[in-house]
């Protein structure tokens, strides 16, 4: 196997937001804008945005932003004043913590939980050889 010196940088910030105001948690257009701005604040390149409102009394909003460096997602449960978020970015130039800070400043939860996982790979990556 041939060795190659590469660094694959992956940073994953995810968690829950409690006490999100209902008027924010139900506004699909507003939430789309928030997640796009969060992606941009992280230094990520927005590629595609999709969102939808789940109808009904227990409906909510989901927003997915596909970035060239990975993705951001936000899902709300307005009946519980609750939302979850997932911010995964690749590359040294991105900072998912900046996206998280923007979510906090925009959605203004009363409290939150946040987790971080370093999903980077070791510097030495073994390249697969073709089968014979």
From Swiss-Prot:
Its cofactor is pyruvate. Disulfide bonds: none annotated. Keywords: Autocatalytic cleavage, Decarboxylase, Lyase, Polyamine biosynthesis, Pyruvate, Schiff base, Zymogen. The keyword Ribonucleoprotein does not apply. The keyword Lyase applies. Its EC number is 4.1.1.19. PANTHER family: S-ADENOSYLMETHIONINE DECARBOXYLASE PROENZYME. Specifically catalyzes the decarboxylation of L-arginine to agmatine. Has no S-adenosylmethionine decarboxylase (AdoMetDC) activity. This is Arginine decarboxylase proenzyme. The lineage of its organism: Archaea, Thermoproteota, Thermoprotei, Desulfurococcales, Desulfurococcaceae.
């Amino acid at each position: 196997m041939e060795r190659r010196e590469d660094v694959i940088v992956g940073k994953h910030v995810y968690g829950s937001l409690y006490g999100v105001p209902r008027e924010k948690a139900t506004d699909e257009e507003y939430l789309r804008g928030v997640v796009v701005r969060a992606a941009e604040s992280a230094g990520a390149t927005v590629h595609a945005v999709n969102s939808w409102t789940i109808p009904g009394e227990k409906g909510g909003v989901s927003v997915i932003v596909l970035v060239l460096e990975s993705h951001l997602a936000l899902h709300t449960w307005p009946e519980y004043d609750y939302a979850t978020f997932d911010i995964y970015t690749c590359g040294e130039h991105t900072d998912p913590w900046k996206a998280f800070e923007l979510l906090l400043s925009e959605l203004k939860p009363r409290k939150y939980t946040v987790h971080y996982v370093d999903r980077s790979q070791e510097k030495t990556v073994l390249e697969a050889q073709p089968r014979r």
